[in-house]
């Protein structure tokens, strides 16, 4: 019987697709692979409530964050839009306006655009490449147990913001819209529609002579990001529940919609925050110079696995979508 993706898991499927090819999949610590992301209408966004300019901006953030996580300076950005018949020139111009704004903000030197017809809604495909300084490459330390797990911002907010938008869409369609709720949870909604990353983070780290030993962008929840770092470094990792940063209204909204913000942080999507591992000897300097980052855990010996540590000290194995159960042990 043919295996399904749900049985094999995304990560194992990717690994097996490379088996016997003579190629190795570019990993978390790769310095040459371009960053690439595809956004599909109806899967990754809903144009009923997603402003086109925000969509263009977010698409660039998604690939730029991958470059920053690998300590690369943005160089070139390539965008291909699959355009459906329902979209006109003005709408595509609005979307590309968001792309251009982000490209300027993050310092890209080249920007290209291609347009293709689409029968199945809007498709936004973005690829970015960047350059790592030779001195940074030489200085990059080997990942070690006790390296600190440091996150650039709040987690779970994008997933919770999406729930607010979806709930408001249902109300809008039934004629019972609540504008005051959108205002109340605007920070959560903003985390989903218009995520932000620190544009000068690579320069700042290089100037401070703090070079992360590893880094990933949180795209499918913190659990997935930690497991990707664990696979790339060959080490375990411990994340502490009480150290995870949340947006202010996360727990109030979580109670209202019966969603645990911790689960949203661990397995929600599109937070687009950068997770670095910083050598523990750089702790005091990093805390002083990068106060917007939160220290949420540390790398550990491989036998420790990847775990979530509760305030009571219990260690719970991380589970992440796309990973087989044995990969989560």
Stretches found by the model and what they are:
Residues 1-329:
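Helix-biased detector of long, well-ordered alpha-helical tracts
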